[in-house]
A protein has these predicted regions:
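Hydrophobic ligand-binding cavity/cleft-lining segments
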Residues: 1-37, 97-151
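Ordered, small/hydrophobic-rich secondary-structure cores
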Residues: 6-89
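Residue-identity detector for threonine
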Residues: 16, 25-28, 39, 49, ...
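Short, exposed beta-strand/loop patches in secreted or surface proteins that constitute
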Residues: 36-46, 69-71, 153, 168-174, ...
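Generic detector of intrinsically disordered, low-complexity, polar/charged segments
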Residues: 37, 54-57, 72, 146, ...
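Beta-strand/loop substructures that line and gate deep hydrophobic ligand-binding cavities in soluble
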Residues: 54-103, 123, 173-229
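Glycine-centered secondary-structure boundary/capping sites
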Residues: 118-119, 157, 198
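Acidic, Ser/Thr-rich low-complexity intrinsically disordered segments
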Residues: 124-186
């Protein structure tokens, strides 16, 4: 058994349609994940307005991303992002999975806006690390939140107080129950409370200052793991 879903999120961006198109189709390491993770077929590739990527599997499974981009005054753009597909497994769990995907999508598109406003076009180094199994506990994200020095009610623009290398001078750019975004002059740090969705706490970094990718991943993994041991 399985359940289909469709999640649509709309927002404006501080960039032209051409810049948004480039970010969505070629610069995903700067705000989402590396483009090689997008292994589906390009069903539509109409620059700079319409893009559809689709993966298909057995028993009717599919995962599809669609972006429709429109110009707005003053060099801005509007994008409608639609993520559709099929949840494997128990359909009764589909509602929770859909909520998790929606929350992730809103956070990712916020990160896209941050990239376009502060780092557009700059080379990026991407790192993705996951907490240990112990981070899946009910208070897993609260442990991370305390280590970052970001209270649940901290407003956008508030200072963080994390001690991990690279986070000096970080400010909050996003803060919800399950997600935190921090921005420095050199990078975007994204923190995911996936313990709320049955997974470990995780983090990604989009570094725009030429960090060594291997050392960056090692440093962050040691820090994150250390919070739960």
């Amino acid at each position: 058994m399985s359940a289909e879903f469709e999640i649509a999120v709309e927002r404006e961006f501080p960039a032209t349609p051409e810049q948004v198109w480039q970010a969505v189709t070629a610069e995903t390491s700067a705000w989402l994940f590396p483009p090689e993770a997008m292994t589906g077929e390009e069903l539509v590739f109409e620059a700079p307005t319409h893009h559809v990527n689709r993966m298909e599997g057995t028993d009717g499974w599919f995962n599809q991303l669609e972006q429709v981009i429109e110009p707005r005054p003053n060099g801005r753009s509007f994008m409608r992002w639609v993520h559709s597909g099929v949840f494997p497994g128990d359909p009764a769990e589909g509602e929770d999975q859909e909520d998790g995907i929606r929350q992730h999508t809103v956070f990712y598109l916020h990160t896209l806006a941050e990239y376009l406003e502060h780092f557009a076009g700059r080379p990026v180094v991407f790192a993705d690390v996951q907490g240990p199994e112990t981070s899946m506990a009910a208070d897993g994200f609260e442990v991370l939140r305390a280590a970052l020095g970001v209270a649940a009610d901290a407003p956008v623009g508030a200072a963080a107080s994390a001690t991990v290398a690279g986070l000096d001078g970080a400010i909050v750019d996003y803060n919800t129950a399950n997600f935190i975004g921090l921005r420095t002059d050199a990078a975007l740090y994204r923190f995911f409370g996936r313990n709320a969705f049955g997974g470990p706490v995780g983090m990604t970094v989009h570094d725009f200052a030429g960090a060594d990718p291997e050392q960056l991943a090692v440093t962050l993994q040691e820090w994150l793991t250390g919070l739960y041991t």
